[in-house]
């Protein structure tokens, strides 16, 4: 702890108190204390950052039964079903107490082991079981307002910006409303915007020309690999395999997301909830499916 952290906590509590009073709590400060108390316990369940960067420790494939067992008395099975994951047999979780073999393989000393024991997912599930319900209610109310502040009344948006924008990030003022509105649309239905953008500014003949150029570059690179003297046969084979697996993505995707099942109206908050619901269901639809290498992780615009 230091003076800076004390100041930040005070500012954070002030923001929470204001938001929770807006949400209907008579004593915003008392409700804010409940949120901070819960978040402190959640933080204690997190692993030490340095140890948590060890990939050998953070890839843990477990069965549904094993995950449920980690929760003890907490209804983990109901949580899994509530997330729409009831048909999944296996899960990959990042943080679970390492086995004796993993401790030895990764050379964890006693201090490091203490930082990853009893916490992680099992620790979080324990907090979910033991923390008072009124803490969870205040926590969820506050974070719903924080997470959706950009589509809520200006008083809420300004309160959130005052802490996250000014106090934490040192920003003097919010970006213009229209710019944030554009970001909201792009983050919600970005490929629909991208389709219009591509039609206007990157016609099909331009894409065809660039596709041909990239294909020629790939051919030239492949021929160059065959003649490189300093590269061994095994390394060449690996390089050629990597080149053959490369999927060029020029201009815009071959097929755009249509957002067929997304319904929006004139209510900004309701639209945000609809987008979140659509995005989550879309993510679930990919489970167990082959990787779609034509899908883009960026927007044309």
Regions found by a protein language model. Name each.
Residues 50-68, 259-281:
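Long, compositionally biased
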Residues 97, 105, 112-119, 137-145, ...:
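Active-site-adjacent "gating/activation" loops or surface patches in catalytic cores
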Residues 16, 32-42, 210-221, 225, ...:
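Short amphipathic alpha-helical coiled-coil/interface segments
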Residues 1-208:
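Noncatalytic, helix-rich "gating/capping" subdomain that lines the substrate-entry/channel surface
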Residues 227, 250-257:
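Amphipathic alpha-helical coiled-coil segments
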């Amino acid at each position: 702890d230091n003076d800076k952290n004390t100041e930040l906590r005070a500012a954070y509590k002030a923001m929470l108190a204001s938001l929770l009073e807006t949400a209907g709590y008579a004593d915003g400060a008392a409700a804010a204390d409940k949120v901070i108390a819960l978040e402190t316990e959640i933080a204690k369940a997190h692993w030490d950052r340095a140890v948590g960067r060890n990939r050998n420790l953070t890839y843990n494939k477990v069965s549904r039964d094993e995950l449920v067992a980690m929760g003890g008395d907490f209804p983990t099975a109901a949580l899994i079903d509530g997330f729409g994951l009831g048909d999944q047999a296996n899960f990959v979780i990042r943080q679970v107490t390492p086995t004796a073999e993993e401790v030895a393989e990764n050379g964890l000393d006693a201090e490091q082991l203490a930082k990853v024991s009893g916490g992680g997912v099992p620790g979080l599930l324990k907090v979910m079981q033991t923390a008072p319900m009124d803490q969870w209610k205040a926590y969820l109310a506050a974070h719903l307002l924080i997470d959706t502040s950009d589509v809520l009344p200006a008083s809420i948006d300004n309160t959130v910006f005052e802490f996250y924008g000014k106090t934490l990030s040192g920003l003097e003022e919010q970006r213009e409303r229209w710019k944030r509105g554009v970001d909201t649309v792009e983050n919600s239905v970005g490929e629909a915007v991208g389709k219009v953008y591509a039609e206007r500014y990157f016609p099909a003949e331009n894409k065809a020309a660039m596709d041909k150029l990239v294909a020629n570059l790939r051919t030239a690179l492949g021929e160059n690999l065959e003649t490189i003297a300093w590269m061994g046969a095994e390394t060449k084979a690996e390089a050629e395999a990597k080149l053959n697996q490369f999927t060029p993505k020029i201009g815009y995707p071959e097929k755009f997301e249509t957002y067929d099942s997304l319904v929006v109206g004139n209510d900004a908050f309701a639209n945000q909830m609809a987008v979140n619901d659509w995005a989550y269901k879309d993510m679930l639809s990919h489970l167990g499916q082959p990787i779609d290498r034509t899908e883009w992780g960026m927007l044309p615009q």
